[in-house]
Amino acid sequence: PGVGQTGSLEDLNAEKSYGAMKVHMNTVAGNEMLVLESVKRYPNANFYGLNPGIIKTDIRSNFMGHNKALFGLIEGLIGLLTPSAEAYADKIVPLLVAPDLEGHSGVHFNKTGDAILPSPGLTDSHVKTFLAASERLIARIGVSVAH
């Protein structure tokens, strides 16, 4: 959240061509839009966006195919330069359970727990269009979304 990504509607499901970063940034934008829209759809619940940045995990293990050496090298560098998942959790979990957070649904937080602004291109119109396209994709497999 808050990194300026608005998502790419022309090939939302990467069926025409696949680009790892393009697909990843679509999910980043989509997650941010889910927070923004959920605040409006479900006013009795709280929603927050998290942008931890790059964290050392196994989530990228398929990104480099089966090249375990390259994966190990890259994850090792990431581990040296960025916080671990545990360090991020130590910082963010107390924030997410703080009583002062009540009433601030829709806020996005960066890797240090500071509030950040939503991406500027995520207008109400764009969010509705993107989420409608997402709902059409999942409807193809028989899943419907309640509004």
What are these regions (language model features)?
Residues 139-147:
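Generic C-terminal helix-cap and adjacent flexible tail
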Residues 30, 45, 49, 72-140:
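C-terminal helical subdomain
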Residues 1-44, 51-69, 74-77, 81:
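Catalytic loop of short-chain dehydrogenase/reductase
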Residues 38-42, 98-102, 145:
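Alpha-helix termini
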